[in-house]
Amino acid sequence: MSAYSMLSERIAMAKELIKRAESLSRSKKGGIEGGAKLCSKLKSELKFLQKIESGKVAIKESHLQSTNLTHLKAIVESAENLEEVVSVLRVFGYTDSLGEKQTLVVDVVANGGHTWVKAIGRKAEALHNIWLGRGQYGDKSIIEQAEDFLQASRQQPVQYSNPHIVFAFYNSVSSPMADKLKDMGISVRGDIVAVNSLLNHPEEYLLSESESDDEGQELLQVTRVDLDNVLARVAFPTEIKVDVCRRVNLDITTLITYVSAMSYGGCHFIFKEKVLTEQAEQERKERVLPQLEAFMKDKELFACESAVKDFQSILDTLGGPGERERAAVLIKRINVVPDQPSERALKLVASSKINSRSLTIFGTGDTLKAITMTANSGFVRAANNQGVKFSVFIHQPRALTESKEALAVPLPKARTNDSAH
């Protein structure tokens, strides 16, 4: 293929990838974190290729074999093939084995955060050679990168379990490397190809003692990837087993939302309080109760004593008869436990968003290793800003409204029917 036809092909590929990346970003309500960054990187690649096309930059084969574009294509393809993608090109901070602060870029975070994917576009030969010490100085082997991923994932638990790591190879991977990754607990996606021993090996394939590690020595130093001999074609795991957390800690905001008259059809009013009218409008558009029930299904429910006590106090003051009745039924389903905030929760500095009550509730959930259900997103963000990330399920709030209905204006029948649940 001539350089110019290769250039045209690359430009077409970049344009197509931009469309696919933009489509990916739109596929999730609220967008995918990092989607704009991915599109921006692709547009930069396209701009550079167009400069070559216009003659502003001299044409070189190395430019056309851009590893950036290959890598970005691998990211797009990975994201398209995974469920519940939450972010792309996500940067995580972690501490390495020497105690140094490091950062790691995860190409695709999927499965609601439970799966980390590294998308690899480089050819199997290059990856295999780097592993065996035949790469350029400073090249980090895939196995070394896998160790970084494992180290970082242990420090970024999602709902109290470490993310599962998948290395997705789009230009094959050698069988020994795939085996090593699997031994490390990493899933492999892509074509797994054989390697052949070189019986009449030239001198340059031999590794000096200083260049190789024990692992490399052990593993046939003189091997060559055989791309024609595909041993296995491995697709993305369709169902990655995730240790689903079965414990749920209920915040006061969730207890109130769960029993609110508004959650049971009482949303067809214009209330005197603007905030209640806004909540009613939100409820007509999107019901909250089915979301809460779906998340709570088959899980053990907990609430700390402070949460239940304050909930009862609010209920006694503002609750209507139906809301109190539903609350009595709900409390019977809950394991009420003593307040026991975790150490890391107690280290939080008080602020307008972080008060002792929230700290106790979320901290108790942390001690229980439970996911805290809450409408208090302000606390979650404030804690996150202080470096404490709680496992949470965030939903929209609903206030106790049964006693307010008498003074509210019912919506006209037509509007009620249009937005009926």
Swiss-Prot record:
Pfam families the record matches: DUF1308 (PF07000), DUF5614 (PF18474)
Superkingdom of the organism of origin: Eukaryota
Listed InterPro entries: DUF1308, DUF5614
Family to which the UniProt record says this protein belongs: Belongs to the UPF0415 family.
UniProt protein name: UPF0415 protein C7orf25 homolog
Organism annotation: Rattus norvegicus (Rat)
